[in-house]
From Swiss-Prot:
This is Sulfite reductase [NADPH] hemoprotein beta-component. GO terms for molecular function: 4 iron, 4 sulfur cluster binding; heme binding; metal ion binding; NADP binding; sulfite reductase (ferredoxin) activity; sulfite reductase (NADPH) activity. PROSITE patterns: NIR_SIR. Binds 1 siroheme per subunit. Binds 1 [4Fe-4S] cluster per subunit. The gene is cysI. Its cofactor is siroheme; [4Fe-4S] cluster. It comes from Yersinia pseudotuberculosis serotype O:1b (strain IP 31758). Siroheme binds at C484. GO terms for cellular component: sulfite reductase complex (NADPH).
Amino acid sequence: MNEKHPGPLVVSGKLSDGERMKSESNFLRGTIAEDLNNGLTGGFSGDNFLLIRFHGMYQQDDRDIRAERAEQKLEPRHAMMLRCRLPGGIITPQQWLGIDKFAADNTLYGSIRITNRQTFQFHGILKGNVKPAHQLLNELGLDALATANDVNRNVLCTSNPVESALHQEAYEWAKKISEHLLPRTRAYAEIWLDAEKVATTDEEPILGATYLPRKFKTTVVIPPQNDVDLHANDLNFVAVADKGKLIGFNVLVGGGLSIAHGDKNTYPRKASEFGYIPLKHTLAIAEAVVTTQRDWGNRTDRKNAKTKYTLERVGVETFKAEVEKRAGVSFSAIKPYQFTGRGDRIGWVKGVDKKWHLTLFIENGRLLDYPGRSLKTGVAEIAKIHQGDFRLTANQNLIVAGVPEKDKARIEALAREHGLMDDNVTSQRENSMACVSFPTCPLAMAEAERFLPEFVTRVEGILQQHGLADEHIVLRVTGCPNGCGRALLAEVGLVGKAVGRYNLHLGGNREGTRIPRMYRENITADEILLITDQLVGRWAKERHVDEGFGDFVIRAGVIAPVIDSARDFYDVQEAM
């Protein structure tokens, strides 16, 4: 535990404008309902531009045509991205068919994007289709409440179909945590579902009238898999089992990856171990962590508002003691746990329940019908006959779960027919990931999703050239320092700096338990590949048995490990 810099429990000073917006929003209503009927613009204006995020949407535009439209004196082509709340990533085939049809009929791009937070996004919903989108989700038994902005976001849960009973228990807790921490305001139901307006004052007993200081992310993790990247999250419940039965959780708090270029007061941070709790205290601890962050988080500076900064300011032990006090629970010592990897097991695996589970690799999570590979149609065809469920993974893949032996051949035939199973996909491609970035993300500084496939092809060539064709490096590209692509937990992480330029980070590990350090700043893809070629050449010759690339570059002295990111993340480390 690190108590080097204890500071004030509450940061004084002028509140950020985001706090004003929330306090004046009437519990997230704003004037969204009126704005919906304003046909003079395709977007939401004023505070509503940000308030719609609490309702699961971001206002975006097509940046590929932004300049062209400006020349024509037209406003940007505004469209919304809508993100579903899907704790643990489980969705039924019937629900899938509903979202498949909506994407085809009512979005500009016609695609479904599986995210690395185990849900799906629609991109390109025009303003007139926004309300029908929410109503469709509601008809399917889904919603988009609290999938963005200053609330507890979609709760992740390890996708472990083999240990079916344990996964089911963990998944149930992910759902309970999600429901417990949801906003209580009726704004979502009133605006999107035409719920009757009730003459009572809204109350937010957990989140408070101005909600949280910043976004808050929660996971339920089943070791030895760390597919959900717990160190990217504010609150983590690491499953502890006895004889295959869930008995409690190790609790880790204060992870997070987003930074701001040029601002050394921002840094990534691994989550800190608080201790072990039995199952019965799970919701009390979740609530206590959230309310402590609600009350102590920095509301004067949004760049310094996340839980990780609160922990560094007040000290881990102080924060932990407050959580114990609020929950009326004392943490026990952490129970032993270990992570061995993060990747999904692509292909068929048989669970202890004798059912089969097929993990389909979906490059960058983008389901669309491409020439010769009708991926989106293929998943829909599987949904028409599948009797189990679908599970969206934190690696942006799709699991067809709970397949009886008699249906296995038929489902595989459909998957192969539509290009969803490809025996030629390399381990390197399976272990590479990017955020959406251009053309829809307004924060994008460099390409990510559109850049990754060809970049991976070139990395595959380097591995093959050095006799490592069957090896892989955990490779991630994020289009800006907000870090949605989780590049700052990769062995090789690219963080977008400008169009065509990235900061290159090296030295994470395969398990996702070490933050990579910046090795080169603001360089091109060609420069990155040249460095990769040189270092992979050394890795091929000098590595120990089963030594991953990230571990190798640390051991070989290419770069020093990040030990305490709040203090050493920006230390300059010259290559040896």
